């Protein structure tokens, strides 16, 4: 928070997750928690409680489908697909069966039992150091509230039904909240909690509603009716803005509108530097419908297809045929551009209960997951590999293995892949004769041994999010030490150069698929280090493309030489920003 005693203007800083600037009166939405009273029931009442539960699930499913339809009609099926995760919750047989069992054993009312079971599911996901899985926890919480309201005979909450335009301030917003709000009267959104990857943030961007999250206890500091200016680009919520501030933001908004218009013109252009070097610019996706954004933003295919969603919130593992159909359809839509599929990066604790025997881990993020889990559960691994190989018949599929720590793991993974190829050949099932295989470099040991791994694969893809986290021993979602998560740390740059040099020494291409690839301030650094491909969130592709088109490889290499003489992350970042500002300063404003 910052303020000026003379003007009484007060600024609160959060994370801007949906661009745009809005000004208006605040409406503070207080959380309406559903109080669930616990009471005993007789064994003879269990059947009635089950009937109530089933009715509430049906009502909830219908409400979700109605919201999904409204979103599909107003902003498109891609965003409406967000509610598929909600439907999975109300159809989750594992969760439902546990509720039914506890009804019979605990002999308590179904509201209490359902809340207890669903809350435990959500809390388990919330403890995981993964924004995607934490978002699934919010989905469960959202659906839980809706089911309980239906069990209690209450109508859906209407606190978002504003009668005049306001800036909405809330503790948190679920996808249901965002989909249900009266968009004509919501100028902008600010919340205590949330992240850029939250479904509410995604919907806000699609609805073109400026939004800020992570303002901590902003709901306790503001009152309905206060005048605020919301900057969804840089994350500032300004209370009682001065005329000077209002005028400054009007000018900023005008400039940004011009930049946005220019970026749209780049959709059909290639990401080629001023001196003629082509940098492959791909997009990261999680769901099949994300391909819409890949196409809309002019990306050259998919540099990272996270396949984890196929395994989450379901009572059984996905079959080979189910996976094949999904991968094939995505590949066909992306063709002729490449589709790089990462084998699933989860631990056994995220799969359907009873699928594998697992033990509690103190630190699952450093534990039994990704390729480590796959190599101990060959049947699950081979099912996915066979599906990917079958989809490779489309002609543009590549595969990469996550969390490789050394040569033995990589060779074992490739051996399993070769077994799957032989099985498909024996069954005379179509697949690509030549399939490119890559290793994700996201563990320091793999970075240091990149020259040992390179001869075994066709490309290297650097997962900078985890590589930085592991190299610096920093939990990037821990607010107390998040400032130590520094992509420009001298050690990180040396690891990146080590990887790029190893790849090129063996005539491989090397890419970056972490958040660094979408940071336009760091694009000159990555090009100077020798990266051949950058894969970022689709929405960032036009900005990265413009950055690439504004640079030359020699000046980027010179930048790297200079940064290797600097001692701190802040000094290196300042030098990167200097070049970025010189070449495309309008994008940084």
Feature map (PLM): residue ranges:
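Non-catalytic, soluble scaffold/interaction modules
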Residues: 1-333, 339-346, 373, 377, ...
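Conserved alpha/beta-domain cores
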Residues: 260-589
């Amino acid at each position: 928070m910052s303020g000026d005693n003379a003007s009484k203007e007060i600024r609160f800083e959060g994370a801007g997750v949906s661009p745009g600037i809005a000004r208006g009166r605040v409406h503070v939405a207080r959380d309406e928690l559903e109080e669930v009273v616990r009471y005993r029931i007789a064994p003879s009442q269990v059947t009635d409680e089950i009937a109530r539960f089933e009715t509430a699930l049906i009502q909830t499913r219908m409400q979700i489908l109605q919201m999904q339809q409204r979103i599909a009609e107003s902003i498109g099926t891609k965003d409406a697909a967000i509610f598929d995760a909600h439907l999975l919750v109300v159809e989750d047989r594992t969760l439902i069966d546990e509720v039914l069992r506890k009804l019979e054993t605990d002999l308590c009312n179904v509201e209490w039992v359902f809340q207890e079971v669903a809350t435990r599911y959500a809390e388990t996901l919330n403890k995981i150091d993964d924004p995607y899985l934490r978002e699934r926890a919010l989905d469960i919480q959202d659906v839980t509230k809706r089911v309980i309201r239906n069990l209690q005979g209450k109508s859906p909450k209407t606190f978002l039904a504003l009668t005049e335009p306001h800036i909405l301030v809330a503790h948190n917003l679920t996808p249901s909240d965002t989909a249900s709000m009266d968009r004509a009267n919501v100028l902008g959104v600010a919340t205590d909690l949330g992240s850029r990857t939250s479904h509410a943030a995604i919907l806000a961007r699609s609805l073109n509603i400026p939004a800020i999250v992570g303002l901590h206890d902003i709901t306790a500091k503001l009152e309905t009716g206060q005048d605020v200016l919301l900057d969804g680009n840089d994350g500032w919520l300004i209370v009682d803005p001065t005329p000077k501030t209002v005028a400054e933001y009007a000018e900023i908004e005008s400039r940004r509108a011009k930049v946005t218009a220019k970026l749209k013109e780049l959709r059909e252009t290639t990401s080629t530097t001023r001196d003629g070097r082509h940098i492959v610019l791909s997009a990261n996706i999680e769901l099949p419908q994300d391909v819409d954004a890949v196409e809309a933003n002019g990306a050259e295919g998919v540099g990272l297809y996270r396949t984890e969603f196929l395994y989450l919130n379901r009572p059984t593992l996905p079959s080979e045929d189910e996976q094949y159909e999904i991968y094939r359809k995505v590949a066909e839509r992306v063709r002729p551009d490449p589709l790089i599929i990462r084998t699933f990066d989860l631990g056994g604790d995220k799969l359907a209960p009873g699928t594998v025997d697992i033990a509690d881990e103190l630190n699952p993020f450093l534990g039994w997951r990704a390729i480590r889990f796959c190599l101990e559960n060959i049947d699950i691994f081979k099912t996915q590999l066979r599906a990917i190989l079958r989809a490779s018949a489309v002609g543009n599929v590549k595969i990469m293995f996550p969390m490789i720590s050394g040569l033995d793991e990589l060779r074992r993974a490739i051996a399993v892949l070769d077994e799957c190829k032989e099985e498909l050949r024996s069954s005379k099932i179509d697949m690509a004769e030549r399939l490119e295989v890559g290793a994700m470099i996201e563990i320091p040991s793999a970075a240091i041994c990149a020259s040992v791994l390179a001869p075994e694969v066709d490309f290297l893809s650097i997962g900078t999010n985890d590589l930085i986290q592991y190299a610096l021993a920093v939990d990037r979602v821990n607010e107390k030490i998040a400032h130590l998560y520094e992509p420009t740390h001298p050690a990180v740059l040396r690891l990146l150069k080590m990887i790029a040099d190893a790849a090129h020494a063996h005539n491989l291409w090397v890419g970056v698929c972490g958040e660094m690839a979408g940071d336009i301030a760091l694009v000159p650094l990555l090009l100077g280090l020798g990266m051949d491909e950058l894969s970022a969130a689709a929405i960032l592709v036009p900005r990265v493309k413009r950055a690439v088109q504004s640079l030359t490889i020699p000046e980027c290499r010179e930048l790297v030489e200079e940064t290797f003489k600097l001692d701190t992350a802040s000094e290196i970042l300042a030098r990167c920003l200097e070049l970025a500002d010189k070449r495309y300063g309008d994008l940084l404003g």
